[in-house]
Amino acid sequence: MPRKTPIERYRNIGISAHIDAGKTTTTERILFYTGVSHKIGEVHDGAATMDWMEQEQERGITITSAATTAFWKGMAGNYPEHRINIIDTPGHVDFTIEVERSMRVLDGACMVYDSVGGVQPQSETVWRQANKYKVPRIAFVNKMDRVGADFFRVQRQIGERLKGVAVPIQIPVGAEEHFQGVVDLVKMKAIVWDDESQGVKFTYEDIPANLVELAHEWREKMVEAAAEASEELLEKYLTDHNSLTEDEIKAALRKRTIANEIVPMLCGSAFKNKGVQAMLDAVIDYLPSPADVPAILGHDLDDKEAERHPSDDEPFSALAFKIMTDPFVGQLIFFRVYSGVVESGDTLLNATKDKKERLGRILQMHANERKEIKEVRAGDIAAAVGLKEATTGDTLCDPGKPIILEKMEFPEPVISQAVEPKTKADQEKMGLALNRLAQEDPSFRVQTDEESGQTIISGMGELHLEIIVDRMKREFGVEATVGKPQVAYRETVRTVAEDVEGKFVKQSGGRGQYGHAVIKLEPNPGKGYEFLDEIKGGVIPREFIPAVNKGIEETLKSGVLAGYPVVDVKVHLTFGSYHDVDSNENAFRMAGSMAFKEAMRRAKPVLLEPMMAVEVETPEDFMGNVMGDLSSRRGIVQGMEDIAGGGGKLVRAEVPLAEMFGYSTSLRSATQGRATYTMEFKHYAETPSNVSEAVINAKQVGRG
């Protein structure tokens, strides 16, 4: 079956923004104008097509990036039909993982900014992620009809805060309630959209007299930026500033955008149906097709470098970038095809797991509606049914020509909570639900706490875990109660305790019990638990020595201070005695346990707490606030450096986990939400005595 749309006319784009910049409304308008969606869904009615999880519709925020295919022939119908695959990405910092994984499979991005709020915190995070994956981008300043709208301030902020070179290709006509349309700086005409047709119809008009001078000033800047694309153009431009043709300007801006040198900038009001149509034209004019992007690199099964070009003639290769559970078809694997062709029913190799699987149905998604298709080709984004083994980040490829594409990296979870099923019936369903959710979301983990037997869930933030618990209830019918975030303390000793004995004797008629062990206990930093048998002359028979060790090992699970596990201790079994009739394994197990408890009390027991390596990326203006806040949390700052590309400062610190609860909220308020942080476990360290006392007292109160 020949290709319907040439790969040069594909655009795989993401629409990214800070929460509330109006990104979902913008996507809705795209679906409307491209004819996919005949009724405009409004976010504030909870009717937006792309926000298809119930929680998203309630909260009015986008959580899951949905993939949608649309077709566009240009605002004036003067382009050959282009196929646009849109990945909608969330704007909340707890869902950064979703943005990260969609950036990995995009060719270009449209950054949506609020005309009043401008470059906000999540905009900075998304920008860094786009830099990491070298994603070319255009900027759309939305909500130009709001009070306080300022297009040119946002243009400056992109330069100052993001170190991006924003090149306006439009300027607004009017602002706030007088916002009417835009001046197209390439055509040097004003575009006015018709309200009656919801912006489907528009007219080109002369530039309003009061804007002519400003339009010429910004056109000059745009043409100069275009001229820098090549020596020839620059020479032509320097000879005569008006000599560049419309086609030359567009081609030059396109070249520089794809090289990540400039960011073309547009504006509008998605809600008022103005500007989105021209933004779609800019997606076609300036963002790359899969053919404009370098070949994707990977390695074969022998670890030799390999690459795939975006062509149907190359062997099939694709990356699974998202897993979702669909109520009708079960598990959906979203994947991006980088090369080759695959049909439903074909056998694929999951090169990451080295397992072959048959590809069942292939679905093209429009938000949460689906259309079955027979095949996918290089550049396509689709969802597959029937792949049991695939997880996020896996490479799918031709079994005859294996390749493993660069793996996605996912951050470690930073917050944990205990979760308990409310009823026995919920118990079984909860395990299944949590495993399914963990499969969908690599930044969410599930484990069982050996000490308490509780199920512990870990994720990227409090909102993240809240939504997981909510999804368990809605999608799997599991009612669960959630505990407070917890810290896993440990206990150890500071000094040596020698000749400590444990004697377990029970002799009251009949067969008695007799076990007697003498031990030496010492610190064993960083080496865990060790047991040394130093018995001489058979004072304890050989067969009873493992029982002493077993008794101590059981006692390690609950220390003498607050019942936390004991780590990093060395025990020497030095002496003891036995009774020919009454000694048995159980008696020596008890003797070992008693000796260890007593030795621990004598060897100055201390509490250990987990220390976290914390990295904070912050704009320079907030350095003082960030450092002060870390110090107040018993943090030790270990270094600072400039972020590449001038994006502020990176602060490295070591902070106790116990002090990090509520940190994301506190960091947001200390930096107006413009800083982000990551945190991972580093090692255990001794807890200061005042903190240690509070923990021990709380534990004793808890035991009642």
From Swiss-Prot:
Protein name, per record: Elongation factor G 1
Gene Ontology CC annotations of this record: cytoplasm
Disulfide linkage: none
Keyword tags: Cytoplasm, Elongation factor, GTP-binding, Nucleotide-binding, Protein biosynthesis
CDD domains: EF-G, EFG_III, EFG_mtEFG1_IV, EFG_mtEFG_C, EFG_mtEFG_II
PROSITE patterns cross-referenced by the UniProt entry: G_TR_1, G_TR_2
Keyword check for Nucleotide-binding: yes
Primary location recorded for the protein, binned into one broad class: cytoplasm
Annotated source species: Burkholderia mallei (strain ATCC 23344)
Top-level taxonomic group: Bacteria
Gene Ontology MF: a single term: GTP binding
Membership in a protein family: Belongs to the TRAFAC class translation factor GTPase superfamily. Classic translation factor GTPase family. EF-G/EF-2 subfamily.
